[in-house]
Amino acid sequence: MENRYRIVCPFSFDFFDGYWRNFRDSGTDEPVMRLSLEAKNVDLYGTETLPVYDGGKAFRVSDSVLCVNRDFTEGKICGNSDDIQGIYGCAMVALYGNLIRRDTLVMHSSMIECNGEAILFTGPSGVGKTTQAELWNEHRGARIVNGDMVFIHKDDDGRFYACGSPWHGSSEYCLNVKLPIKAIVTPIKSDECRIEAVSGMEMLRRVFPEVMLPDWFDGCKELGMSTLDGLLKSVPVYKLECTKDIRAVEALEMKLG
């Protein structure tokens, strides 16, 4: 993704932590979104003042509030510097409200790089996404890009690319990498290893719950569904019944060729 996002922090708060610094950009191109962070404005009567954008909306995450304009190109996060969860959550709302208009999805998944392409392990928390990613790292030297949240973008060439994101959950994996997607894999814990391609309703049932499809503005969810439909028509999806050892790597490797 070539879009640039600029974050301005007018009070002491290191928004760009060790992981966020991987995504810092020093380019001079005009940004597609401006997002600023300011301290809450609460008077002595406990009344809070928030900025207002004509036709825009306000979103509360934890103790922070995001006020954003109609097309999600400009916004302000009002919060205290110690509300990390709220500030990061508001930033995600602002960013994704912009990206979903640009053929981009957010998928709950672990992303690895193998031979210049991305393999995405997706599924509910605890299913073994990061475990499978780490097995590929251990046995095949695959690089783990992100262990929790991945951007998926349809580029100008019509291909779908997976992009590392600054949001990484409890995972320590958080790299700024963009790769064409080779496959989406839905792991299931098992005593044996079996893999098969899935399609139709089963494919949708396995992937749909892991894609963030908000309803923040008119047509928002429909935009996301359109991009998801294109993704599932372009990228193979596999169900991997797997163990927590090298056999799982070998089974998937054989299937992918």
Predicted features and spans:
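Hydrophobic positions on the alpha1 helix immediately C-terminal to the Walker A/P-loop
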Residues: 132
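Conserved lysine of the Walker
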Residues: 129
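A noncatalytic interaction/capping subdomain that flanks phosphate/NTP-handling catalytic cores
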Residues: 1-125, 135-145, 150-257
